[in-house]
Amino acid sequence: MQPYTAPSEIALRQLDYFADKHVLVAGEVEDRFPIELRQYCASVSVFTTHYGYYSQLKAYPEITRYFGEQLTADLNADLILLYWPKAKQEAEYLLAMLLAKLGTGTEIVVVGENRSGVKSIEKMFAAYGPIHKYDSARRCSFYWGHCVHTPAAFDIEQWFKSYAVDYQGHELTIRSLPGVFSHGEFDLGSRLLLDTLPPLSGKVIDIGSGAGVLGCVMAKLNPHIELEMTDISALAIRSSQETLVANQLHGHVYPSDMFSDTGHHYNYIVTNPPFHSGLETSYSATERLLAESVDHLASGGSIWVVANSFLKYPPILEQAFGHCDIAAKTNKFAIYHAKK
């Protein structure tokens, strides 16, 4: 984990708000601040939808950690520290879910970068109670609020967006939760990748499955493949599972930080990899994925990657595989292919 993010630094200036509280941390938290916060609080729990962060917290037994698309466990918390997520709809989702769980009387601290749209909390929280900004620093804002109105019961079904994808005469229903890549649309990069793929057979893994578009189209066109779909986001995992069910398709969907929890000997690795971490652009995870992919392929297996054309991924694949082919290219996207 890196040094403290700017939202954590502004929270660090306001430790009195957390003194002796049972704090539940949620949202776009990326650093060790919850561990330091434990010194000032009665207890600290972390609910995260990010499997990588959840895995890193395993080293800190003083923190109770929860991973999933929904917090189902019973816990003692009287204050939520919400790190504002990059998607406004995800913030609405987290508020509705967590406040329905904890109820009236719950205090909330919201921290986030101003460019992320954290100011939206002022209107968003109105249904729950008062909230005000109490600090600004490092281009971030610090809000404190109090839930005084009874939150509505939370029903996750109300948060799915369903939309149709028509591909080669097959109409698929895609189910997507807030915060999932390409929420509510069939992105052009995924379409180009599907247009370029050969007929598939054997073990196929879709890494960074999002709402499950790639995996489900591959399963529809190649019904005999053994399909796995992974993502670092619990919201994406649930979305991919729902998309499979909606289309009566089969596959194994599970959380993994790139190859952290996957198997080996895949015949095909197919990926539309993410390159955003929070609000920042980050390529390190994808570069690691490309470099390690050769170790997870069967002999004769291949990787197929879609990426923005300007990204310098071919040298990484060339170093790992000894070659890299550009299978397709547009003004915006390129399809890279390498075979073991």
Swiss-Prot record:
Q: What is its EC number?
A: 2.1.1.172
The answer on whether this UniProt entry bears the keyword Calcium reads: no
GO cellular component annotations of the record: cytoplasm
What are the protein's UniProt keywords? Answer: Cytoplasm, Methyltransferase, rRNA processing, S-adenosyl-L-methionine, Transferase
The enzyme's first-digit EC class, named in words, is transferase
Q: Would you say which domain of life the source belongs to?
A: Bacteria
Q: Where in the cell is it found?
A: Cytoplasm
> GO:BP terms for this protein?
rRNA base methylation
One Pfam family name is: MTS
Q: Which reaction does it catalyse?
A: guanosine(1207) in 16S rRNA + S-adenosyl-L-methionine = N(2)-methylguanosine(1207) in 16S rRNA + S-adenosyl-L-homocysteine + H(+)
What is a GO molecular function of this protein? rRNA (guanine-N2-)-methyltransferase activity
Where this protein primarily resides, as one coarse class?
cytoplasm
CDD domains assigned to the protein according to its UniProt record, in alphabetical order: AdoMet_MTases
The family annotation for this protein states: Belongs to the methyltransferase superfamily. RsmC family.
HAMAP family given for it? 16SrRNA_methyltr_C (MF_01862)
Concerning PANTHER family, the annotation shows: RIBOSOMAL RNA SMALL SUBUNIT METHYLTRANSFERASE C
Subunit comment for this entry? Monomer.
User: What is this protein for, i.e. what is its function?
Assistant: Specifically methylates the guanine in position 1207 of 16S rRNA in the 30S particle.
Return the protein name.
Answer: Ribosomal RNA small subunit methyltransferase C
Taxonomic source organism: Vibrio cholerae serotype O1 (strain ATCC 39315 / El Tor Inaba N16961)
